[in-house]
Amino acid sequence: METLFQKTRVINGEPELIQNESIIYKVDNVSIYDGDQKTQYSNGTVMLSTHRVIWVNKDIGLGLLHQLILNIEALTTGLMGIGSSPKILITLTKRSFRLSFHAGRRDDFLKLYRQSLLNKPSQSPSPTSSTSQFINQPNNNNNNYNNNNSYQTPLQPPQYQQQQKEQQQQYNSYNPYQQQSSQSPQQPQQQYNSYNPYQSYVQQQQQQQQQQQQQQQQQQIPQYQQQTSPPPPNYYEHIQQQQQQQQQQQQQQQQQQQQQQQQQQQQQQQQQQQQQQQQHQQQQRQQSPSLYNSYHSTQQPLPPPSYLQHMQQQQQQSPSPSPQYQQTNSNSLPSQPPQPNYNLQNFINTPIISNNSNNNNTNINGFTSNAGIGGIINQMNKKTLENDKLLSESFSDLNILMEKAKDMVTLSEKLKVTLEKKTGTSTSTEEEEEFRSFLLEMGIESPVTKKTAKSKYHDQLSKQLSDWIITKNILKQHKGSGNNEMITLSDLYCIFNRARGIELISPDDLYRACLLFESLDLPLRLRKFDSGVIVVQSKDENDEQIAKQILDIINENGPLSAFDLAKINSISLHLAKDQLLVGVTSEKLGKLCRDETVEGNILYHINIFVD
């Protein structure tokens, strides 16, 4: 592999630079591949300079001049580039190799590498013998690689142009006398015997065909590759700008087409409406024939009734004319009946436009909008608009209520403090008790939410629930707990959600929060009876205390059933059965005995045998 690159001395981990050479970019953890095989030069540092690419390790340094490079491109290996490091393929005249970037930063290195190839110096150090050996080495690796991001350096001519130069040098260096002098005396005789007069003609035709092919290939090459000078530095940016402009033009054209289509649709709708109006007017004209025709068969419209009424009012208000004026008028009247100048038909067909702007049943064209399918659609649209207005107004009111909810909770806390101070001095009235219960229902000032607590939501919810149950005395004040400090999970869910107001929680969140009571060392615990009833009770509550309370009830009221216990303690029937029979029951403790009748009734008595 050392023959591929030019050896470079390494001093303290840095390569020895050439004159007027400077380092542009460095990338660590880079390996060199010879085709698909990984070489011994791995996990080194690649340095990009103004004249060459240098691979450096602790002991050795390898450099490759920019003048020898024909092509560089990004290479993707594996399935969609998954499971392999990004690579760069560097192609020379008769050989190629790869640089594998294990730590990334391949694209930045490739971008700067291309810029350095465009800006490489015109005079660079001549390659050593090792590089000439590398150029003459054959390329035995036929690699299939991706040509998506290929880059052809415009300063180096293609391979076919180099072959042409080599052939021309061979033709120019041809000397027939030199061959004759080196030949033996027997060779001229053999040449004369093997002389073919058509051979020179065939060679000329072959040369002409080669020249034509070369001209065709040069025409296919872009102009910037035929020129010796590199493309301008802003060439690629200019191409990108052109592409962006083309995309913008296409988008504008699409928008214009959409606007034109919308205009055409609107025009078609207007035409359809006009046709419907004309048909409606024709139907009205056919149904109402002309009421009065003149003697000369000239149909002229009559004045509207409002005009006639206006004229009559003016005549009544004006003073009566003089007799002379009446005589002249009576003399001037013709013997024939007056010829009407108007036709009532046109007056009937004219639309009656109401002055009331809220009248939505009539259109400007004189026919009702509720007629036909169009009228039904208009009514449906009106209803949807009204519903949208109602919803928007109601939601705006809800948003205002949600904003004011926190202020109401803080106010309730202040009032509660004042009431507690008052109860310390004097007795409370019924109104104060009702007001205190109302403040209890107002609930929590700043409830825990998933937005505020995030990953610690259930922990903080469990702590807040425990503090709220203890401070509000929920276990003692709840009617369903009786004398026992115990409440079912369903009742707790209803009370706690009512206290939270708007920020409601799900049953699953409440259950998870209750499960964390013991792990967070809180004074409550969650308990599940064999019947499936789940309750929240005090951590200090035990079975013996429950049994003692049941014994006291039996001593006062006599033998009782599960129904009687549920009625006395105001608890559910299932919870009463669980207290008597399952888990924490007094029967298992041996302090009660039961009497089962044939009818199925079960009564619990004090166990006199133990006493």
UniProtKB/Swiss-Prot annotation:
Membrane topology according to the record: Peripheral membrane protein
Main location: cytoplasm
Domain GLUE N-terminal: 7-94
Keyword Amino-acid biosynthesis in annotation: no
GO cellular component: ESCRT II complex; late endosome membrane
Residue span, GLUE C-terminal domain: 97-129
Record region (Disordered): 119-193, 213-243, 280-346
Compositional bias of kind Polar residues: 288-300
GO biological processes: protein targeting; protein transport to vacuole involved in ubiquitin-dependent protein catabolic process via the multivesicular body sorting pathway
GO molecular function: phosphatidylinositol-3-phosphate binding; ubiquitin binding
UniProt keyword annotations, A-Z: Coiled coil, Cytoplasm, Endosome, Membrane, Protein transport, Repeat, Transport
Key word Transport present: yes
Regions annotated as coiled coil: 204-288
Subcellular location per the Swiss-Prot or TrEMBL entry: Cytoplasm; Endosome membrane
Chain intervals with Low complexity compositional bias: 121-193, 213-228, 307-334
Role: Component of the ESCRT-II complex, which is required for multivesicular body (MVB) formation and sorting of endosomal cargo proteins into MVBs. The MVB pathway mediates delivery of transmembrane proteins into the lumen of the lysosome for degradation.
Assembly and binders: Component of the endosomal sorting required for transport complex II (ESCRT-II).
Family: Belongs to the VPS36 family.
Name of the protein this chain belongs to: Vacuolar protein-sorting-associated protein 36
Gene name per UniProt: vps36
